[in-house]
Design a protein with these regions (language model features):
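A short, structure-level motif marking secondary-structure boundaries and short turns
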Residues: 18-20, 89-90, 122-123
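Local sequence-structure signature of Cys/Sec-based thiol-disulfide redox active-site neighborhoods
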Residues: 1-28
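Extracytoplasmic
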Residues: 13, 40-43, 147-149
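Short, exposed beta-strand "edge-strand" segments with a Pro/Gly-rich flavor and a Y/T-containing core
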Residues: 10-11, 92-99, 107-112
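Extracytoplasmic/secreted proteins, especially bacterial periplasmic and envelope-associated proteins
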Residues: 29, 33, 59-63, 67, ...
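Structural alpha/beta surface segment adjacent to cysteine/selenocysteine redox centers
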Residues: 3-4, 25-96
Length: 176
């Protein structure tokens, strides 16, 4: 994944959409690799909410994610990966009509999140139950000086995303 957007002047909406798509591409490319590294005990994965792009979809997804973490944590990573895979599809097809609670419910069900939990998505999102969590995650991210997502740290050092552009590059970097 390369940060091509850094050298191009884009209007804020286009820039935010491109940054979100790059994050979705990264997460989709590395989902299986990250799962394997976790299963093998080679990494610790910490997913933190971060709303740096100002998109309404982020509010929907973060509130749903907070609920999944609280009520069905065993499926949180699968849900996370499925949300980014769906977002990438939406961005590639330029179909913002799919940025809905109903889409998140379908994604959650596909990812194995219990129906009892996905049935709570609408109320959780409408009440903005996890907004304080998202705000705290975003403030922490910014206070640490991070600028974009995804942010990858290996042995405490932030990784340049150009180092992890292949599907096995995280594994190679960690095994160095």
């Amino acid at each position: 994944v390369t940060a091509h957007y850094a050298t191009i002047q884009l209007d804020p909406h286009t820039r935010h959409a491109l940054e979100a798509m790059l994050t979705a591409e990264f997460d989709t490319l590395h989902a299986d690799e990250i799962s394997t590294l976790l299963d093998d005990g080679k990494i610790t994965l910490a997913l933190h909410p971060c709303k740096i792009l100002g998109q309404d979809w982020t509010d929907l997804a973060m509130n749903a994610m907070g609920l999944v973490i609280d009520k069905d944590p065993d499926n949180a990573l699968a849900f996370h990966n499925a949300v980014f895979e769906e977002y990438l599809s939406i961005a590639q097809k330029q179909d913002p009509s799919r940025l809905t609670v109903e889409t998140l419910v379908a994604v959650g069900e596909k990812a194995g999140v219990s129906g009892e939990v996905t049935a709570q998505f609408k109320d959780t999102i409408t009440s903005r139950a996890y907004d304080a969590w998202t705000k705290l995650g975003t403030e922490t991210f910014q206070n640490l000086g991070f600028k974009g997502t995804p942010t990858i740290l290996v042995r405490g050092e932030q990784i340049d995303l150009t180092q992890v552009g292949a599907a096995d590059s995280l594994t190679k970097l960690i095994n160095k």
